[in-house]
Amino acid sequence: MKITKIEKKKRLYLVEIDKKESLYVTEDTIVKYMLTKEKALSKDQLEDIKNFAQFSHGKNLALYFISFKQRTEKEVRDYLFKHEINPHIIPQIIDNLKKDHWIDDYKLLESLAQQNLNSGDKGAYALKQKWLQKGCEKQVIDEVLTQFDFSEVAIKVTSKLLRKYQGKLPTKSLKDKLIQNLINKGFSFQESKNAINQLELEADEENEQALLYKEIEKQYQKFSKKYDGYELKQHLTQSLFRKGYDFDAIASALREYF
């Protein structure tokens, strides 16, 4: 068999064999196998050309994908599969890219962890879950995260949350709110407690009393439609306690209110 036609098509070349079979190859394939019109090919040579063309095309696609930003190994695999690169060729492409340091999950995660340390707002658990979803190996993730201490990030996030909620909640509810928000962002319970302790929250008794009376009025409007007397006081007490107000402060305020 021989090549009867070679035609450039954007990034690829169309190679026609015996005016019957055709395939698309990269420029690297043309150069590597010195493909020219009328060149004779054996069956084995043609198979080698097809495999290398897939490899070369897949690698070019991967490099294009990586050029926009760093990618995990799984992201590159999925991208190649999506673009219909032969599944048997994909591992070769990945190995080649890793050998040339185009793909390096460890360094990528190190970079992302450092970014989070400098300007992010996530704890280690949130980062780990995100990276696992990206297909990174648990062992690699754990090795990277052991290098970083995100306690300062937790303090920064706590300070920001404090500006949002302080003065709007009693101290106990405020602390609970802060801890829940921090846990949701991937910090451990202990990291969350330590961050709050670092900021040394102080109760504003005058403000808390004002909040309590305001809440009593609100809850009274709700429960007085169904209850009165002792039952009303019980429901008010339970509701206010669940909202983080001190039991003694509730009892004192209700005595004044009634």
Curated annotation (Swiss-Prot):
User: Gene encoding it?
Assistant: recX
Q: Which UniProt keywords apply?
A: Cytoplasm
Any Pfam family matching the protein: RecX_HTH1
Mind telling me which InterPro entries this protein's record contains?
A: RecX_HTH_1st, RecX_HTH_3rd, Regulatory_RecX, WH-like_DNA-bd_sf
Superkingdom of source = Bacteria
- For this entry, list what GO says about its biological process: regulation of DNA repair
An example Gene Ontology cellular component term from the record?
cytoplasm
Question: What is this protein identified as?
Answer: Regulatory protein RecX
* Signal peptide feature range: none
Q: Where in the cell is it found?
A: Cytoplasm
Matches recorded under HAMAP family: RecX
Q: What is its main location?
A: cytoplasm
Write down the PANTHER family for this protein, in alphabetical order: REGULATORY PROTEIN RECX FAMILY PROTEIN
Q: What does this protein do?
A: Modulates RecA activity.
Q: Which family does it belong to?
A: Belongs to the RecX family.
Q: State whether keyword Cytoplasm applies.
A: yes
